[in-house]
Each structure stands twice: as C-alpha cells, then as structure tokens.
Amino acid sequence: MEELQGYLERDRFRKQHFLYPLLFKEYIYTFAHDRGLNGSIFYESAEIFGYDNKSSSVLVKRLIIRMYQQNYLIYSVNDSNQNRFVGHNNYLYFHFYSQMILEVFTVIVEIPFLLRLVSSLERKIPKSQNLNLRSIHSIFPFLHEYPNWNSLITPNNSIFLFSKENKRLFRFLHNSYVSECEFVLVFLRKQSSYLRLTSSGAFLERTHFYGKIEHLHLIVVRRNYFQKTLWFFKDPFMHYVRYQGKAILVSKGTHLLMKKWKCHLVNFWQYYFHFWSQPYRIHINQLSNCSFYFLGYLSSVLINPSVVRNQMLENSYLIDTVTKXFDTRVPVISFIGSLAKAKFCTVSGHPISKPIWTDLSDCDIIDRFGRICRNLSNYLSGSSKKQSLYRIKYILRFSCARTLARKHKSMVRAFLQRLGSGLLEEFFTEEEQVVSLIFPKANSFSLHGSHRERIWYLDITCINDLVNYS
C-alpha cells in the first residue's frame, strides 16, 4: 500500500485517478506497474491510446476477454526445447502448479485511468446502454467499448515484448483463473461466498454471462463451435447421487463438458480431501431415459432475478448487481413414478404397503423408510416450495404405517394411535442435523439483507434402498 501511495504521489498528472480493486473472495484485481516478474507481464506501452503510458486499461479489457475464451486447459509455450508445462492428462502437475500460482502469485492488473478517458467514454456510450451493463465489470465503462473484440490478450506484433518465461507464466495465471472460476464444484458448498455475485452458486460471475448473452449470440453467428458454450452457460446445473456404491454426476451436456467436469473433480477431491483419486476410475457414460425416470430427480429450474449488493473499498462504493437465482421445483410426478415402480404407492400416489419388508423387525422397517425420506428431503430442501416434498413424505410415512400394520395384522389408524408420535420423528429431521460438507464461511464482507442460501447436500439420495430391497 505504501508503494501504491508513493506511485500516485509521484504521478505527473495532477488530475484525480480512480483505483477500483474488485474483490471476489480469493481473487483480486489490483494495481501494478513496470516492476517484478522480470518486467511485469501485464505491461505494454499505451502512448498510442492517448493517456499515461503506465496505465494499461486496454490490456485489462483484453485480459478479461481472454479469461472467458474457450481454452480452459493449461497448454505449453511453442518452444521445442521446453518440456510441456502441464500435460493434458497430468492431473498431478495441473493441481500442483495451479495451487502454487493461486497461493504465491496474485493476478495483478494496473487499472488507474484519467478523468478525461471516463468523460470521453461517457459521450460515446448512451445512458440507456449504461443501464444495461449488468456485467460484474460494469463499473469499468471502457470494458464495453468494443463488445465484439475477440482478440488475444497480446497481439502478435507485440508478443516479442514478453520473455518466454513470462509468456508461460501468464498463460499459467490465465488458465488457472479460468479453471478455478468455471469448474469449482460449488454445488458441494453449504453456503456460497458473499462475493460470488450469484445466489445460486453456479458460477462465480454468472451475471457476466447473462449480461453478455447478446454478445455471445453475435459470436455464435461467426463461430459455430461457440454454440455449445453458450448453452452451457444457460444450463450449468449438476446433480449428484450415490448409486450402488458409485458416485454419479448427472448433467445435460456434451462429452467435452463431461471431460472438463471429470478433470476438475479429480483436482477438487485431491485438494480438499487429501485423497489420491485415479482419473481412470472416473468413467463417462450416457444414462438412458429410463434411468433418469428411475432415479426420479431430474429437477426443473426456474431463473428468477434478484439484486446483490456489493460492498467495495471499505464502504466507499455500494453497487447493486442484478443476478439470476436458481429456484428449483420438486419433480413430484417423477418421484411418484419412481415410488410406484418400487411398490411404495400406486401410480396415482396412493400409499400402499411393502409386503417384502414385513419379515423385518419394526425398527428396521421404520429405519429404512425414514432413511429414504430423510435423504430425499435433504436433496429437495433446495426448493423454495416444499408442498411437493410434503407429499412425498406423506406417501412414505403412510406406506411405512401400512407395512407395519400388515405385519401386525392391524388397522392402520389403530396402529398409528398406538405408536404415537414416534413414527413422525423418523420422517422429519432438521436440516442443521444433517451431516454435510461444510466450507468455511466468508466473513470479510456481508450483503445487505442477505438470507440463508438454499443448498444441495453432498449426501443426497440413497436410491439403493429403492433397488436392493424391492
């Protein structure tokens, strides 16, 4: 900070400068000038643009554009004398170097710019367009000056400014950032970080994607391969289930998307759980429609707009960012179909007994029904409307009661009166009592009027109970 103050004081321009450190949680855009890293990989002469040659706002724009391009994997520099920096399938080195970069190096970008630049851009951009800048970077108007600019971070005619080591390091930083940004398994988090700028936790900067959706459509016209990425941004939701001793990730997507999830899942598992996982043990298979029907949890997703308030520069700026939150609906028809196939109810949802379980003890019967109900409840607790969840609980509860009554050759009503509230306790468990994967809560910033996140638990459904005992 002392260097920053000295740098601003020595600046030959007496006009006011603006510094906008844009904070996420573990990522930060901050300042830098021509020093460090063998000559600052982010430096380029900007005299041709008409302002301070130490400022590099255009380079900032190129950097951000580059971050959202298609190439998410680390690649090596075109140097035959150098070994590959990180191989495509070498997950160990990918994990090691990405963590080293994120922990040791900070992505530093110099973003001071002059008032005359701001005023000139304000004349170019109409007020109506300013209102539509929903990107996380909308506080930088110059980032929207050329929406169709799809060039690399450094043009070919200036690539010689960087040494080979710096080019390799820069690509390292860029790919590490993109990999962490796009493929963190946020659906495992109990609570999203406050500075993710998304209430659903699907992406760190999902508002940027939706704010730029028209821009992506323009790219689709010129480059057909971008269509899949555009669809991927619109439907990024992933499902997790444990099925017959295996962990299954379910998503609608292309084979390339599944390979990216596989790559990051290996790194995520090894880093957070300190457990070595062999990539070849993760298989990519296509589930048939009947498999989805049997699992019975292919949920519907609504995207509702909401406002997130960002706190920046120690209360100096309060910015309301429009984001789109997931609101999941319980697929009650699919669940009833699965329960009917497993002989817990009729196709119309009327509870029936489970004759095959009548040979078990009362405790085992109640435990099996209760375990199924609790696991389904944990999965469906992410929905804001729980009427369908209560219906599923009703079916399982009365199916359990009918099974016990059939075992004891008694009427269901009489059996429920004799059992009392003990049966109810097995089917209603508070969410706080569920053992789930909990990440540390971010406490650096807080949002005005923030509420508890609706979450998806790691232990979602044990469909084994619907299979092995049917």
Curated annotation (Swiss-Prot):
<dbReference type="GO" id="GO:0009507">
    <property type="term" value="C:chloroplast"/>
</dbReference>
<dbReference type="InterPro" id="IPR002866">
    <property type="entry name" value="Maturase_MatK"/>
</dbReference>
<dbReference type="GO" id="GO:0003723">
    <property type="term" value="F:RNA binding"/>
</dbReference>
<keyword id="KW-0934">Plastid</keyword>
<keyword id="KW-0507">mRNA processing</keyword>
<dbReference type="GO" id="GO:0008380">
    <property type="term" value="P:RNA splicing"/>
</dbReference>
<keyword id="KW-0150">Chloroplast</keyword>
<comment type="function">
    <text>Usually encoded in the trnK tRNA gene intron. Probably assists in splicing its own and other chloroplast group II introns.</text>
</comment>
<comment type="similarity">
    <text>Belongs to the intron maturase 2 family. MatK subfamily.</text>
</comment>
<dbReference type="InterPro" id="IPR024942">
    <property type="entry name" value="Maturase_MatK_N"/>
</dbReference>
<protein>
    <recommendedName>
        <fullName>Maturase K</fullName>
    </recommendedName>
</protein>
<dbReference type="GO" id="GO:0008033">
    <property type="term" value="P:tRNA processing"/>
</dbReference>
<dbReference type="Pfam" id="PF01824">
    <property type="entry name" value="MatK_N"/>
</dbReference>
<keyword id="KW-0694">RNA-binding</keyword>
<dbReference type="GO" id="GO:0006397">
    <property type="term" value="P:mRNA processing"/>
</dbReference>
<dbReference type="Pfam" id="PF01348">
    <property type="entry name" value="Intron_maturas2"/>
</dbReference>
<keyword id="KW-0819">tRNA processing</keyword>
<dbReference type="InterPro" id="IPR024937">
    <property type="entry name" value="Domain_X"/>
</dbReference>
